[in-house]
Amino acid sequence: DRFYNGDPENDVETREYFYIGDYSSKVTDWNKYPAAMGVREFYGGDLQGVIDKLDYLQDLGVEVLYFNPLFVSPSNHKYDIQDYDYIDPHFGKIVEDGGELLSPGEKSNKKATKYQKRTTSFANLEASNELFIKLVEELHRRGMKIILDGVFNHCGSFNKWMDRECIYERKKGYAPGAYISRESPYHDYFRFFSDEEKDWPYNGKYDGWWGHDTLPKLNYEESVKLENYILNMGRKWVSPPYNVDGWRLDVAADLGRSNEYNHQFWKKFREVVKNANPDAIILAEHYGDPREWLGGDEWDTVMNYDAFMEPITWFLTGMEKHSDEMREELRGNADNFTRAMTYHMANMMVPSLLTSMNELSNHDHSRFLTRTNHMVGRVAELGPEAANEFVNPAVMREAVAFQMTWIGAPTVYYGDEAGVCGFT
């Protein structure tokens, strides 16, 4: 959303819908700092913007694009997926528009008819998938690859399976969501704390990931249909005509309600993905020892927090990766750095190390350049301007030298190449 706006016609509008206590907001000043709670702010970046800037990315030396989620979702981060089958038209193409924005003071998305039209129209959804195909084809023509973000532990409250916001209620081509009706075909996709006829319609008593009602936890163990659907999504996007080159798996160890089921699912996921595209990579977001998933029958590799981002950050800045803590005794401590790297690298076999995602910054943590200012705190406490103060570009360059030469796949968070700063 904050990369490049190639198609202003698909921009999210102010008051297009209501989410987490406020309206969606269209930002017109690209120099404006994002709000501390900026999940509803949209700068207009889209897939056409990426296509327009592929020469720049290729000249920079980029070989693989890893996207945060692109599927239909109400937030700008899109880890609250509304529809796994389609690219969000606000990133793709809006060919069929209409409906009304919410009036000031109106908070019910039942009346967000413009948002409903944009995100449920099959014309918009199919056109957005077609634009995505065009992007992938152009990347492959250039010898580049693409990785998608798979958010399969939970979905969003806007999701057509739950439909807490009544976006899909009585829409042609869509079945009732589990929030709407106990007879919904998606009822078993979720765990309801109160599951009697009297709790419907509009049953909001369901399990959310970490208690967030905007992130309903998916209930795999009680729904073979759900499991098969998500496995099919894993297969679909790495197969023609989409031909994606791999998946990054969000909070992968959290999926399911037991460790036993988690391993069972990822074995099945690997089988369907590799059968469809043997060269597709499967890498997981994971904190801690990943060995039990890296036996060759589940994940290929991980986002390398333990054996790259954290040791490098402590060694060069003395900061915790969220900027939550400063430990002066770890800055420049070569013995601690060597021990940490040696210990955590030993938890991965060589193939996993060679392909591990070595990042300095990403969407979950403060920017590395900001960590060089040694300020402890987050944007809500310190403000966005403080992220730029007292930074040390020389330390950033030193970190990049490590990143580009260390075993693994150097992965640059967009903006780092231009010296962008920012707190968590």
Feature roles, as predicted:
Residues 2, 71, 88-91, 152, ...:
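Short, flexible loop/turn elements at secondary-structure junctions
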Residues 295-306, 359-378, 404-424:
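Aromatic/acidic polysaccharide-binding cleft in carbohydrate-active enzymes
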Residues 212-216, 250-255, 352-389:
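Active-site clefts of carbohydrate-active enzymes
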Residues 62, 241-244, 408-409:
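A structural motif
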Residues 57, 67, 84, 139, ...:
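Conserved, mostly hydrophobic/aromatic
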Residues 1, 65-67, 146-148, 247, ...:
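Hydrophobic faces of well-ordered beta-strands that scaffold small-molecule active sites
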Residues 136, 140-144, 153-154, 158-198, ...:
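Active-site-proximal helices and loops of the catalytic beta/alpha 8
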Residues 1-145, 153-155, 160, 208-228:
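N-terminal structural segment of carbohydrate-active enzymes
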